[in-house]
A protein has these predicted regions:
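Extreme N-terminal leader/targeting segments of oxidoreductases
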Residues: 1-11
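Patatin-like phospholipase
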Residues: 9-17, 22-120, 157, 162-170, ...
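Hydrophobic/aromatic beta-strand patches that form the interior of the parallel beta-sheet core
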Residues: 46, 148, 158-160, 231-235, ...
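Active-site periphery "cap/insert" segments of enzyme catalytic domains
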Residues: 109-147, 158
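Active-site gating loop/helix substructures
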Residues: 138-225
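Glycine-rich anion-binding loop/nest that anchors nucleotide
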Residues: 209-216, 230-239
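C-terminal helical/tail subdomains of lipid-metabolizing enzymes
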Residues: 237-239, 259-349
Length: 349
Protein backbone atom coordinates (compact mmCIF):
# COMPACT_ATOMS: atom_id res chain seq x y z
CA UNK A 1 0.00 0.00 0.00
CA UNK A 2 1.39 3.35 -0.96
CA UNK A 3 1.50 6.08 1.63
CA UNK A 4 -0.84 8.99 1.08
CA UNK A 5 0.85 12.00 -0.48
CA UNK A 6 0.51 15.43 1.12
CA UNK A 7 -1.58 16.75 -1.78
CA UNK A 8 -4.07 13.90 -1.24
CA UNK A 9 -4.81 14.99 2.34
CA UNK A 10 -7.78 17.38 2.79
CA UNK A 11 -6.97 20.68 4.54
CA UNK A 12 -9.31 19.87 7.45
CA UNK A 13 -8.24 16.45 8.63
CA UNK A 14 -8.49 14.67 11.98
CA UNK A 15 -8.44 11.32 13.72
CA UNK A 16 -11.19 10.60 16.24
CA UNK A 17 -11.42 8.73 19.54
CA UNK A 18 -14.98 7.96 20.67
CA UNK A 19 -15.71 7.05 24.28
CA UNK A 20 -17.96 4.34 25.58
CA UNK A 21 -21.35 5.25 26.96
CA UNK A 22 -23.97 2.67 26.03
CA UNK A 23 -27.02 4.17 24.32
CA UNK A 24 -25.41 7.59 24.64
CA UNK A 25 -23.54 6.75 21.43
CA UNK A 26 -26.13 8.89 19.63
CA UNK A 27 -24.45 11.93 21.19
CA UNK A 28 -21.18 10.79 19.63
CA UNK A 29 -22.88 10.65 16.24
CA UNK A 30 -24.14 14.22 16.62
CA UNK A 31 -20.60 15.43 17.31
CA UNK A 32 -19.16 13.52 14.35
CA UNK A 33 -21.80 14.90 11.98
CA UNK A 34 -20.96 18.43 13.15
CA UNK A 35 -17.33 17.76 12.22
CA UNK A 36 -18.44 16.45 8.82
CA UNK A 37 -20.61 19.52 8.25
CA UNK A 38 -17.64 21.73 9.14
CA UNK A 39 -15.66 20.10 6.34
CA UNK A 40 -13.47 17.72 8.32
CA UNK A 41 -12.22 14.53 6.72
CA UNK A 42 -11.82 11.82 9.35
CA UNK A 43 -8.94 9.48 8.61
CA UNK A 44 -9.04 6.95 11.46
CA UNK A 45 -11.49 6.31 14.29
CA UNK A 46 -10.96 4.58 17.63
CA UNK A 47 -13.97 3.51 19.65
CA UNK A 48 -14.89 1.87 22.93
CA UNK A 49 -18.18 0.02 23.50
CA UNK A 50 -20.90 2.21 21.94
CA UNK A 51 -18.12 4.28 20.40
CA UNK A 52 -16.87 1.17 18.61
CA UNK A 53 -20.27 0.76 16.92
CA UNK A 54 -20.18 4.35 15.68
CA UNK A 55 -16.50 4.26 14.75
CA UNK A 56 -16.51 1.12 12.63
CA UNK A 57 -19.68 2.06 10.73
CA UNK A 58 -18.35 5.55 10.00
CA UNK A 59 -14.98 4.13 8.95
CA UNK A 60 -16.75 1.74 6.59
CA UNK A 61 -18.96 4.50 5.19
CA UNK A 62 -15.97 6.80 4.61
CA UNK A 63 -14.70 4.48 1.89
CA UNK A 64 -16.39 5.95 -1.15
CA UNK A 65 -18.44 8.49 0.85
CA UNK A 66 -21.31 6.02 1.12
CA UNK A 67 -23.37 7.92 3.70
CA UNK A 68 -24.30 11.60 3.83
CA UNK A 69 -24.48 13.44 7.15
CA UNK A 70 -28.28 13.19 7.06
CA UNK A 71 -28.10 9.44 6.45
CA UNK A 72 -25.65 8.99 9.33
CA UNK A 73 -28.06 10.80 11.65
CA UNK A 74 -31.07 8.76 10.54
CA UNK A 75 -29.15 5.50 10.88
CA UNK A 76 -28.21 6.37 14.47
CA UNK A 77 -31.76 7.35 15.40
CA UNK A 78 -33.23 4.21 13.87
CA UNK A 79 -31.07 1.66 15.70
CA UNK A 80 -33.50 -0.96 17.14
CA UNK A 81 -32.29 -0.52 20.70
CA UNK A 82 -35.25 -2.26 22.34
CA UNK A 83 -34.45 -5.48 20.49
CA UNK A 84 -30.89 -5.33 21.82
CA UNK A 85 -32.27 -6.44 25.20
CA UNK A 86 -32.47 -10.04 24.03
CA UNK A 87 -32.98 -12.15 27.13
CA UNK A 88 -33.46 -15.91 27.11
CA UNK A 89 -37.04 -16.48 25.80
CA UNK A 90 -38.56 -17.48 29.14
CA UNK A 91 -41.50 -15.38 30.42
CA UNK A 92 -40.71 -13.17 33.42
CA UNK A 93 -37.49 -14.98 34.35
CA UNK A 94 -35.61 -14.63 31.06
CA UNK A 95 -33.07 -11.99 32.18
CA UNK A 96 -32.65 -13.64 35.58
CA UNK A 97 -32.03 -17.04 34.01
CA UNK A 98 -29.57 -15.48 31.59
CA UNK A 99 -27.70 -13.89 34.46
CA UNK A 100 -27.52 -17.15 36.42
CA UNK A 101 -26.47 -19.21 33.40
CA UNK A 102 -24.19 -16.82 31.52
CA UNK A 103 -23.45 -14.16 34.18
CA UNK A 104 -25.29 -11.69 31.94
CA UNK A 105 -28.85 -10.43 31.61
CA UNK A 106 -28.84 -10.41 27.81
CA UNK A 107 -27.26 -12.43 25.02
CA UNK A 108 -26.18 -9.56 22.76
CA UNK A 109 -27.02 -11.56 19.62
CA UNK A 110 -29.47 -8.96 18.28
CA UNK A 111 -26.91 -6.16 18.55
CA UNK A 112 -24.31 -8.40 16.91
CA UNK A 113 -26.60 -9.18 13.97
CA UNK A 114 -27.48 -5.52 13.45
CA UNK A 115 -23.84 -4.41 13.48
CA UNK A 116 -22.79 -7.22 11.14
CA UNK A 117 -25.62 -6.38 8.74
CA UNK A 118 -24.91 -2.64 8.62
CA UNK A 119 -21.20 -3.23 8.04
CA UNK A 120 -22.00 -5.72 5.28
CA UNK A 121 -24.24 -3.13 3.62
CA UNK A 122 -21.17 -0.89 3.47
CA UNK A 123 -18.95 -3.63 2.06
CA UNK A 124 -17.11 -4.47 5.29
CA UNK A 125 -16.83 -7.95 6.78
CA UNK A 126 -13.26 -8.41 8.02
CA UNK A 127 -10.60 -5.95 9.12
CA UNK A 128 -8.89 -6.36 5.78
CA UNK A 129 -11.81 -4.40 4.34
CA UNK A 130 -10.80 -1.42 6.50
CA UNK A 131 -7.14 -1.27 5.49
CA UNK A 132 -5.63 2.23 5.60
CA UNK A 133 -2.92 3.14 3.04
CA UNK A 134 -0.13 4.67 5.11
CA UNK A 135 3.37 3.21 4.83
CA UNK A 136 4.66 5.43 7.63
CA UNK A 137 2.46 3.61 10.16
CA UNK A 138 3.48 0.35 11.76
CA UNK A 139 1.96 -2.50 9.70
CA UNK A 140 -0.35 -3.63 12.50
CA UNK A 141 -1.83 -0.12 12.70
CA UNK A 142 -2.75 0.37 9.05
CA UNK A 143 -6.50 0.29 9.55
CA UNK A 144 -9.22 2.93 9.40
CA UNK A 145 -10.72 1.87 12.71
CA UNK A 146 -9.64 0.28 15.98
CA UNK A 147 -11.78 -0.90 18.91
CA UNK A 148 -10.75 -1.26 22.53
CA UNK A 149 -11.51 -4.51 24.36
CA UNK A 150 -10.69 -5.88 27.82
CA UNK A 151 -9.24 -9.41 27.90
CA UNK A 152 -10.08 -10.62 31.41
CA UNK A 153 -8.27 -13.93 30.87
CA UNK A 154 -4.88 -12.34 30.27
CA UNK A 155 -5.69 -9.21 32.27
CA UNK A 156 -4.90 -6.65 29.61
CA UNK A 157 -6.35 -3.99 27.36
CA UNK A 158 -6.27 -5.06 23.72
CA UNK A 159 -6.85 -2.93 20.65
CA UNK A 160 -8.32 -4.77 17.71
CA UNK A 161 -7.21 -5.29 14.97
CA UNK A 162 -3.83 -4.00 16.14
CA UNK A 163 -3.25 -6.74 18.71
CA UNK A 164 -4.65 -9.81 16.95
CA UNK A 165 -1.25 -11.06 15.83
CA UNK A 166 0.78 -10.01 18.89
CA UNK A 167 -1.60 -11.35 21.53
CA UNK A 168 -3.50 -14.12 19.75
CA UNK A 169 -1.32 -15.10 16.80
CA UNK A 170 -4.18 -14.40 14.38
CA UNK A 171 -4.16 -12.65 11.00
CA UNK A 172 -6.06 -9.39 11.62
CA UNK A 173 -7.17 -9.09 8.00
CA UNK A 174 -9.21 -12.29 8.36
CA UNK A 175 -10.97 -11.42 11.64
CA UNK A 176 -14.57 -10.23 11.79
CA UNK A 177 -15.09 -6.53 12.50
CA UNK A 178 -18.55 -7.18 13.95
CA UNK A 179 -17.13 -9.77 16.36
CA UNK A 180 -14.60 -7.25 17.68
CA UNK A 181 -17.30 -4.60 18.14
CA UNK A 182 -19.53 -7.07 19.95
CA UNK A 183 -16.66 -7.83 22.34
CA UNK A 184 -15.99 -4.13 22.94
CA UNK A 185 -19.64 -3.57 23.95
CA UNK A 186 -19.92 -6.61 26.24
CA UNK A 187 -20.82 -4.63 29.37
CA UNK A 188 -20.09 -6.97 32.32
CA UNK A 189 -23.23 -8.63 33.72
CA UNK A 190 -25.37 -6.95 31.03
CA UNK A 191 -24.17 -8.68 27.85
CA UNK A 192 -22.55 -12.08 27.54
CA UNK A 193 -18.77 -11.87 27.25
CA UNK A 194 -17.17 -12.95 23.98
CA UNK A 195 -14.75 -15.86 23.68
CA UNK A 196 -11.77 -15.60 21.32
CA UNK A 197 -9.58 -18.61 20.57
CA UNK A 198 -5.94 -17.89 19.74
CA UNK A 199 -3.89 -19.65 17.07
CA UNK A 200 -2.42 -21.77 19.88
CA UNK A 201 -5.89 -22.89 20.97
CA UNK A 202 -6.02 -20.73 24.10
CA UNK A 203 -9.42 -19.23 24.91
CA UNK A 204 -9.73 -15.64 26.10
CA UNK A 205 -12.81 -14.00 27.59
CA UNK A 206 -13.37 -10.51 26.20
CA UNK A 207 -15.56 -7.78 27.72
CA UNK A 208 -16.26 -4.07 27.33
CA UNK A 209 -13.09 -2.06 26.74
CA UNK A 210 -14.40 0.57 29.14
CA UNK A 211 -13.53 -1.70 32.07
CA UNK A 212 -9.89 -0.65 31.66
CA UNK A 213 -10.11 2.51 29.56
CA UNK A 214 -13.38 4.13 28.53
CA UNK A 215 -11.88 7.10 26.69
CA UNK A 216 -8.37 6.31 25.40
CA UNK A 217 -7.85 9.63 23.64
CA UNK A 218 -4.13 8.81 23.39
CA UNK A 219 -4.75 5.92 20.95
CA UNK A 220 -3.39 7.67 17.86
CA UNK A 221 -0.75 9.81 19.58
CA UNK A 222 2.61 9.35 17.88
CA UNK A 223 5.27 7.23 19.57
CA UNK A 224 8.21 8.15 17.32
CA UNK A 225 9.00 11.57 18.79
CA UNK A 226 7.74 13.44 15.74
CA UNK A 227 4.90 15.98 15.70
CA UNK A 228 1.37 15.06 14.65
CA UNK A 229 0.41 16.04 11.12
CA UNK A 230 -3.22 16.58 12.07
CA UNK A 231 -5.13 16.60 15.36
CA UNK A 232 -6.80 13.77 17.21
CA UNK A 233 -10.14 14.89 18.61
CA UNK A 234 -11.78 12.95 21.40
CA UNK A 235 -15.54 12.83 21.94
CA UNK A 236 -16.91 11.68 25.28
CA UNK A 237 -20.48 11.22 26.53
CA UNK A 238 -19.57 10.07 30.04
CA UNK A 239 -19.56 12.71 32.84
CA UNK A 240 -16.48 13.42 34.89
CA UNK A 241 -15.93 11.24 37.93
CA UNK A 242 -16.92 14.07 40.28
CA UNK A 243 -20.49 13.81 38.96
CA UNK A 244 -20.89 10.36 40.51
CA UNK A 245 -22.80 7.28 39.47
CA UNK A 246 -26.15 9.08 39.52
CA UNK A 247 -25.07 11.13 36.52
CA UNK A 248 -23.75 8.06 34.69
CA UNK A 249 -26.53 5.59 35.41
CA UNK A 250 -29.53 7.63 36.69
CA UNK A 251 -31.46 4.48 37.57
CA UNK A 252 -28.98 3.95 40.42
CA UNK A 253 -29.60 7.35 42.04
CA UNK A 254 -31.64 5.74 44.85
CA UNK A 255 -28.34 4.35 46.17
CA UNK A 256 -27.74 7.78 47.66
CA UNK A 257 -30.53 7.13 50.16
CA UNK A 258 -28.24 4.67 51.90
CA UNK A 259 -25.09 5.99 53.50
CA UNK A 260 -23.32 2.64 53.19
CA UNK A 261 -23.85 2.75 49.41
CA UNK A 262 -21.38 5.60 48.96
CA UNK A 263 -18.47 3.20 48.50
CA UNK A 264 -20.38 1.29 45.81
CA UNK A 265 -21.17 4.54 44.02
CA UNK A 266 -17.53 5.56 44.06
CA UNK A 267 -16.42 2.13 42.83
CA UNK A 268 -18.79 2.24 39.86
CA UNK A 269 -17.75 5.79 39.00
CA UNK A 270 -14.08 4.88 39.16
CA UNK A 271 -14.59 1.82 36.95
CA UNK A 272 -16.27 3.91 34.26
CA UNK A 273 -13.91 6.88 34.05
CA UNK A 274 -11.30 6.77 36.79
CA UNK A 275 -8.57 5.11 34.71
CA UNK A 276 -8.61 7.97 32.21
CA UNK A 277 -9.27 10.86 34.61
CA UNK A 278 -5.69 11.80 35.46
CA UNK A 279 -4.65 11.79 31.82
CA UNK A 280 -7.71 13.77 30.74
CA UNK A 281 -7.00 16.45 33.32
CA UNK A 282 -3.80 17.36 31.49
CA UNK A 283 -4.38 20.63 29.58
CA UNK A 284 -2.91 19.35 26.30
CA UNK A 285 -5.42 16.50 26.41
CA UNK A 286 -8.58 18.25 27.63
CA UNK A 287 -8.13 21.00 25.04
CA UNK A 288 -8.85 18.48 22.24
CA UNK A 289 -11.76 16.70 23.95
CA UNK A 290 -15.38 17.34 22.96
CA UNK A 291 -17.63 16.76 25.98
CA UNK A 292 -21.27 15.99 25.20
CA UNK A 293 -23.93 16.73 27.83
CA UNK A 294 -25.69 13.40 28.39
CA UNK A 295 -26.43 13.33 32.11
CA UNK A 296 -30.19 12.82 31.65
CA UNK A 297 -29.72 9.56 29.72
CA UNK A 298 -28.77 6.28 31.37
CA UNK A 299 -26.02 4.38 29.59
CA UNK A 300 -28.24 1.27 29.63
CA UNK A 301 -31.63 2.83 28.82
CA UNK A 302 -32.42 0.69 25.78
CA UNK A 303 -36.07 1.77 25.97
CA UNK A 304 -35.23 5.42 25.37
CA UNK A 305 -37.68 7.36 23.18
CA UNK A 306 -36.74 8.80 19.79
CA UNK A 307 -37.39 12.33 21.09
CA UNK A 308 -34.77 11.89 23.81
CA UNK A 309 -32.36 10.36 21.32
CA UNK A 310 -32.80 13.38 19.07
CA UNK A 311 -32.06 15.72 21.98
CA UNK A 312 -28.93 13.72 22.74
CA UNK A 313 -27.91 13.93 19.08
CA UNK A 314 -28.48 17.70 19.15
CA UNK A 315 -26.35 17.96 22.31
CA UNK A 316 -23.52 16.22 20.52
CA UNK A 317 -23.82 18.43 17.47
CA UNK A 318 -23.87 21.57 19.62
CA UNK A 319 -20.88 20.45 21.70
CA UNK A 320 -18.75 19.84 18.61
CA UNK A 321 -19.83 23.11 17.00
CA UNK A 322 -18.89 25.04 20.13
CA UNK A 323 -15.57 23.19 20.30
CA UNK A 324 -14.72 24.04 16.69
CA UNK A 325 -15.59 27.71 17.23
CA UNK A 326 -12.51 28.08 19.46
CA UNK A 327 -10.27 25.30 18.13
CA UNK A 328 -6.99 26.54 16.61
CA UNK A 329 -4.63 23.83 15.36
CA UNK A 330 -1.69 26.19 14.88
CA UNK A 331 -2.13 27.61 18.38
CA UNK A 332 -2.35 24.09 19.82
CA UNK A 333 0.93 23.10 18.16
CA UNK A 334 2.62 26.28 19.30
CA UNK A 335 1.43 25.99 22.90
CA UNK A 336 1.81 22.28 23.52
CA UNK A 337 4.10 20.85 20.84
CA UNK A 338 6.58 23.41 19.51
CA UNK A 339 9.12 23.02 22.32
CA UNK A 340 9.20 19.25 21.88
CA UNK A 341 9.04 18.91 18.09
CA UNK A 342 11.56 21.09 16.24
CA UNK A 343 10.97 19.30 12.92
CA UNK A 344 7.95 19.85 10.66
CA UNK A 345 5.10 17.33 10.88
CA UNK A 346 5.52 14.17 8.82
CA UNK A 347 2.91 11.42 8.42
CA UNK A 348 -0.23 10.64 10.39
CA UNK A 349 -0.54 10.98 14.16
Amino acid sequence: MAARRARDIPPLTADLVLSGGGVRFVGLVGAVVALMDAGYSVQRISGVSGGSVVGTILAAASQGDQLTAAQVKELALSVPLRSWRDAVPLPLVGPVWGFLRDTALYRGDAAHRWIRGELANLGVHTWGDLAYPADDLMPERRYRAVVTVTDVTTGQLVRLPWDYRRVYGLDPDEQSVADAVRASMAVPFFYRPVTLTSAAGLRSTLVDGGVLSNFPIYTFDRLDGRPPKWPTFGVTVVPEISDGVGAMVPVLRPLRLFGQALLLENLISTMLVGHDQTYLNQPWVSVRAIKVNSTDVSVLDFGISRDRLERLYDNGYAAASEFLSTWDWAAYLQRFRAAHYPDPPVGPN
